[in-house]
Amino acid sequence: MATAMDWLPWSLLLFSLMCETSAFYVPGVAPINFHQNDPVEIKAVKLTSSRTQLPYEYYSLPFCQPSKITYKAENLGEVLRGDRIVNTPFQVLMNSEKKCEVLCSQSNKPVTLTVEQSRLVAERITEDYYVHLIADNLPVATRLELYSNRDSDDKKKEKDVQFEHGYRLGFTDVNKIYLHNHLSFILYYHREDMEEDQEHTYRVVRFEVIPQSIRLEDLKADEKSSCTLPEGTNSSPQEIDPTKENQLYFTYSVHWEESDIKWASRWDTYLTMSDVQIHWFSIINSVVVVFFLSGILSMIIIRTLRKDIANYNKEDDIEDTMEESGWKLVHGDVFRPPQYPMILSSLLGSGIQLFCMILIVIFVAMLGMLSPSSRGALMTTACFLFMFMGVFGGFSAGRLYRTLKGHRWKKGAFCTATLYPGVVFGICFVLNCFIWGKHSSGAVPFPTMVALLCMWFGISLPLVYLGYYFGFRKQPYDNPVRTNQIPRQIPEQRWYMNRFVGILMAGILPFGAMFIELFFIFSAIWENQFYYLFGFLFLVFIILVVSCSQISIVMVYFQLCAEDYRWWWRNFLVSGGSAFYVLVYAIFYFVNKLDIVEFIPSLLYFGYTALMVLSFWLLTGTIGFYAAYMFVRKIYAAVKID
């Protein structure tokens, strides 16, 4: 068994690997070279809000539309994310300035919003919706300049520039609602080095926007769709009254700036984290947890187990040794098959399926092969990998089921292929019905749902059956001791051996090893933030695997010392105890970080959180179970049994 020092070289290797790969970026698309005055298309992605968790497509609001609306063909991940990428009427030319242009205005007439349209726009503004646009596949960002005091005299301040994804649809002030009806686009380009006789080409490397609200009376528009912006602050914002019709102009301006940023580094603006030190603190905290558990394991194995096994193997004092060491007393029952072996093996098979999928996704993303420029690639890859990993889940479930004296392999394979995926599909279908009712773009379209079902029954199910068949035919795990025909009576257990107490005790340390990273993951999921520190995430995942394995071994050792041989289900449940703390943290995050008050957004949050907790429990429970199973087989194989 590995000690704390055994993990040191591996930790150093992973640290170096993470440092080398955290900034590594493999583009998902080829660069586009623009010439002077080439059109740069501005597309809309969706509207999002952390208060409602319901995305909407861009033209669900009365924005100006082009003569022909064209939606981009999307992959599975984009559809599941609620993206609906569509063209817009913004006319942007490479390196060509525009001071002010009016959208969808005919003969110098403003746009009139009906009462229903005004009510809808006002509702979206009060719900704090953001608009997401892209130019050359780069998402638009709003620059935020934050000032922090460096000295106690408050004279020196440091400017911290951060970027907010998308731009706010509008704002409220003293019970009045205002719409951002003017967009100042700032696009940065990098001039490519060319031969002397060749024309210069440009590449877009950043896309910013400054949203403004300008009242109709303060904008001067002419018949050529040009307009004049008010100077300085001599203007009032455009109010939206939800109880009546509103007239306004939709306008925009374009400004170009040359940048030293190269095309390969253009995503750094969105992916660079200002709180990397917090991630390092998380890693150090996690390593300390692993070393602490390694120390406990070393003490158990070196001092206790080695001494117990040596004493037990002495032929002249077997009876006395058995009386003083509880874990050896249950050698005839420790491998007795548990209740419901089919369900246990099915859940563990799904856990193996999840483990393989997550490990590959994080590793591939860490290498930069799932770049954010390939929209939806991460989710698409995860879905397909989970289906194809069914062969490994089926194989492990089939072999374990046979080890537990199971005989109905076809039923077991069906249970493995449908139990966990069926629960996930059922919850998602119910939540999707509510999303459909809100006419959100986050609702999975019916054809996509049919396609997912076809992939489930056409790919995942056959692969699970195939793996289960070969796993069931393979030689079962060789248990080192025989099982007695008559079960041994289990003595009364102390209060701290209670299953729920065990879950609380076993879950706290693995959760402590990853809770800081969990905060950033929650921010990415629920607050529409980018997360691309997969180097950190990969290292945290490895530490989570090690800590779950270690705590599982410790818990099963103390259970066997208490002469309780019913460790199969208990260890699976206890090893997934960190999922309980994930649930507690999710509730804390909902109460303290999110401003969700309506029923359907709350239902969506806790519905998806339930899926996350269930999946995390399967993952950590499976890791801990197999670590404990290997440990139990190892220690009983070292004991001589007559």
Swiss-Prot record:
The gene is TM9SF4. Keywords: Endosome, Golgi apparatus, Membrane, Phosphoprotein, Signal, Transmembrane, Transmembrane helix. Residues 24-281, 368-376, 438-449, 523-535, 592-598 are extracellular. Interacts with ATP6V1H in colon cancer cells. One of its GO terms (biological process) is positive regulation of protein localization to cell surface. The chain crosses the membrane at residues 282-302, 347-367, 377-397, 417-437, 450-470, 502-522, 536-556, 571-591, 599-619. It holds the Pfam family EMP70. One of its GO terms (cellular component) is early endosome. The keyword Signal applies. It comes from Homo sapiens. Residues 1-23 form the signal peptide. This is Transmembrane 9 superfamily member 4. InterPro entries: EMP70. Residues 303-346, 398-416, 471-501, 557-570, 620-642 are cytoplasmic. Associates with proteins harboring glycine-rich transmembrane domains and ensures their efficient localization to the cell surface. Regulates the assembly and activity of V-ATPase in colon cancer cells via its interaction with V-type proton ATPase subunit H (ATP6V1H) and contributes to V-ATPase-mediated pH alterations in cancer cells which play an important role in drug resistance and invasiveness of colon cancer cells. It is found in: Membrane; Golgi apparatus; Early endosome.
